[in-house]
Amino acid sequence: MTHSCRLSVAPMLDWTDRHCRYFHRLMTKETLLYTEMVTTGAIIHGKGDFLAYNEEEHPLALQLGGSNPEDLAKCAKLAQERGYDEINLNVGCPSDRVQNGRFGACLMAEPQLVADCVAAMKEVVDVPVTVKTRIGIDDQDSYEFLTDFVSIVSEKGGCEQFTIHARKAWLSGLSPKENREIPPLDYPRAYQLKQDFSHLTIAINGGVKSLEEAKVHLQHLDGVMIGREAYQSPYLLASVDQELFGSNAPVKKRSEIVEEMYPYIEAQLAKGAYLGHITRHMLGLFQNMPGARQWRRHISENAHKPGSGLEVLQDALAKIPKELNV
């Protein structure tokens, strides 16, 4: 399957799990979805299936965390066999836990190793192997530092697509959350990168809050990755196909999306899933609408109760004024 990076939803730890992705996919057929970051160690040695997903989630990219080329190649091969549409290497996450495993943003300082990792994966898979990174780390935040990284990883590793989180990462002193908010955004640097590496596919990530903003970035770049906004106000995804991909399909109402989740939820509950693990991703669906607070509160107070099922969502939906027709 060919897919476009024109719009994607960022890999977000503890957020973009398979329930979240199924929900997002009901709103947009075209948006590229990413898994949460999965470490090579979890896939190779962990108990449980870390590569499971729903067929409906395509186009779907697996984000890997690791720095051992052999392990990454092994995981990439498994992922391709399971049907993933893209393999993405995390060179952007700044958390201590990640650095201790020698992957994430600290790898920006080792571009040759990143190139080796990408090359090892490309050797064993046919799907695209991409890199998500930052504009710099700590005091290594010159434009030359970024261009050296991209040059080496693209020329020696064969990477043709980069998603640039337009902030640098502080590897010590800031939490991952602070690293998403405190370092200033520098979109022009990503635009410049695209001009200087016009043969590469370059997407941007960081601080994008609307499709209008995405359209502005798309005048300069190949793709836009939306993170927290797509999670906290997911309904923005409902008009992506029409606004960015030229679809003529009608935009779904919020209530339709809720009702389309019912069969999935019933099937998951029958397999022993816990309702709250699914509905937590839906809390922001009515963001900024009358009744939104009551919707959120009803789900939050009831989804965790033993034996709770669809009636929780049905009752929550009844809190949204009918005359809104949403």
Curated annotation (Swiss-Prot):
Which protein are we looking at?
tRNA-dihydrouridine(20/20a) synthase
Site description Interacts with tRNA, residues in chain: 90, 177, 180, 293, 296
* UniProt similarity note: Belongs to the Dus family. DusA subfamily.
State the gene name recorded for this protein: dusA
- Explain the purpose of this protein: Catalyzes the synthesis of 5,6-dihydrouridine (D), a modified base found in the D-loop of most tRNAs, via the reduction of the C5-C6 double bond in target uridines. Specifically modifies U20 and U20a in tRNAs.
Any Pfam family the entry gives: Dus
Q: Name one GO molecular function term.
A: tRNA-dihydrouridine20a synthase activity
Give binding positions for FMN: 11-13, 63, 132, 165, 205-207, 227-228
What positions does UniProt annotate as the active site of this protein? 93 (proton donor)
- Give the record's keywords alphabetically: Flavoprotein, FMN, NADP, Oxidoreductase, RNA-binding, tRNA processing, tRNA-binding
What is the organism of origin for this protein?
Vibrio parahaemolyticus serotype O3:K6 (strain RIMD 2210633)
- Using the record, list the residue span of the signal peptide; answer none if the entry has no such feature: none
InterPro entries reported for this sequence: Aldolase_TIM (IPR013785), DUS-like_FMN-bd (IPR035587), DUS_fam (IPR001269), DusA (IPR004653), tRNA_hU_synthase_CS (IPR018517)
